[in-house]
Amino acid sequence: MANEDCPKAADSPFSSDKHAQLILAQINKMRNGQHFCDVQLQVGQESFKAHRLVLAASSPYFAALFTGGMKESSKDVVPILGIEAGIFQILLDFIYTGIVNIGVNNVQELIIAADMLQLTEVVHLCCEFLKGQIDPLNCIGIFQFSEQIACHDLLEFSENYIHVHFLEVHSGEEFLALTKDQLIKILRSEELSIEDEYQVFLAAMQWILKDLGKRRKHVVEVLDPIRFPLLPPQRLLKYIEGVSDFNLRVALQTLLKEYCEVCKSPKENKFCSFLQTSKVRPRKKARKYLYAVGGYTRLQGGRWSDSRALSCVERFDTFSQYWTTVSSLHQARSGLGVTVLGGMVYAIGGEKDSMIFDCTECYDPVTKQWTTVASMNHPRCGLGVCVCYGAIYALGGWVGAEIGNTIERFDPDENKWEVVGNMAVSRYYFGCCEMQGLIYVIGGISNEGIELRSFEVYDPLSKRWSPLPPMGTRRAYLGVAALNDCIYSVGGWNETQDALHTVEKYSFEEEKWVEVASMKVPRAGMCVVAVNGLLYVSGGRSSSHDFLAPGTLDSVEVYNPHSDTWTEIGNMITSRCEGGVAVL
């Protein structure tokens, strides 16, 4: 017996997990024995006895039917229309047992009937079943079915599956049965996993040619999502010449001619066309190549004078995750600027053995060769480069005895550099990137030899500079890239902390810098690019120890902004610092 002097414990609730199951099992037993059944459901030629309370508690449809003042609420026999008796039997069994038998032969009828009866749990289970059955041969059918019944969860899943497996999907018969609007929706997606844009063009043409008589009128509309600036002109021309239908061939030739006229349009019009960045940039999930160009290399523990300028170029495949070598630069150089324009990689300026260069080289991935193009007006190393409005901009840098503060612009059509303005703050070995038609410069080293925190934006059209909030940390030899409407400042160096592993992100929405996850390795003079929604950081140099020169790095890290984590991937073939990286 409890001690009467002890305080009584408060009552505590206890629950039984089996209670609901036992009650449901007993109710089902009563249904099978036709005990207490108060309604008969007539489905086609078959009738099912059940309990109004159980039906109303399981389904808003039945709750409205029996309690909403409808005539069925007082009838002993209630007809259920639009459902086959065998399917209704399965759903009624689920109401009384919580178990549903789903198979490939009944899943579509089940999900339609369950949706009508507002049995959301059965709809969910059917969707999960279809997700488990999806493959490249049936995903289009599942996509169309989910669109037809407005099942948004299954629609999103099947659509994502089509994007990921596009190369397998578009070769199947179901792909050719897409409606025009469904096809266009798929072809517009940034998420198509493709090797190149030409595969999307072929898929569109394949759909048109399947029923040319009826689909001829949709040619322009269906081909509109194709990013023609990314298609090799000769390959496209060869395809068009091979089209047997005369009218279709003429239509394609007209489209190609219009595209070529846009590419050769006057500078003012070209500025407008290049604002349509979705047409000139590869899709987010397209196969891309990272080109690591030039830089210098030095062994760990070597002397400062042991650094060697590089001419070698490596290419990283985002699909295979391997590095391979490609044609080398004509001129070995470090501290250069690297960018991409018109499907070509440009290597600009730089230095070797204290000789600063003004020369520019251009790499054609089709011919796999570097060629020399026009030189800048001023030699520069530690400069910033980016592409804006169809031209290359080269900013600042070290020009010999001082820091250059001029801005040059390269027009590929005229093969000419011209000075177009000046920097607000002279700097070299700074970060530079373009975003939505504006050029951003961050950090670097000033005229006084001090590492900077400052952040500025340049408008190439108005030629005006505007200050933005400074970074939290002074950084020179940093890497910068734009990703998801933010700008990232990665690593770098300052005299107090040496090589940095910290990373800051500028949010335009919040108008401030915030720190994100740090890299695994401190790096200065590394390269940073945004690819497929991720940041790739390659090479650079580590911190110096015991007055020894820091060694160059061959490691590569990838930052995922969604998980705020860094992952190491395959190393470069050659360690390098103060090189450049371009994405094609």
Curated annotation (Swiss-Prot):
Example GO BP: proteasome-mediated ubiquitin-dependent protein catabolic process
Pfam families the UniProt entry points to: BACK, BTB, Kelch_1, Kelch_KLHDC2_KLHL20_DRC7
Residue ranges of the TM segments: none
Entry's Gene Ontology molecular function annotations: actin binding; ubiquitin-like ligase-substrate adaptor activity
Cell compartments where the protein resides: Cytoplasm, Cytoskeleton
Residues covered by the BTB domain: 37-104
Major subcellular site: cytoplasm
Kelch repeat locations: 289-343, 344-390, 391-437, 439-485, 487-533, 535-583
Claim: Cytoplasm is one of the keywords in the record: yes
Domain of life the protein comes from: Eukaryota
Cellular component terms per the entry's GO annotation: actin cytoskeleton; Cul3-RING ubiquitin ligase complex; cytoplasm
KW Glycoprotein (keyword) present: no
Keywords tagged on the record: Actin-binding, Cytoplasm, Cytoskeleton, Kelch repeat, Repeat
Primary role: May play a role in organizing the actin cytoskeleton.
UniProt protein name: Actin-binding protein IPP
Organism whose genome encodes this protein: Homo sapiens
Name of the gene encoding the protein in the UniProt record: IPP
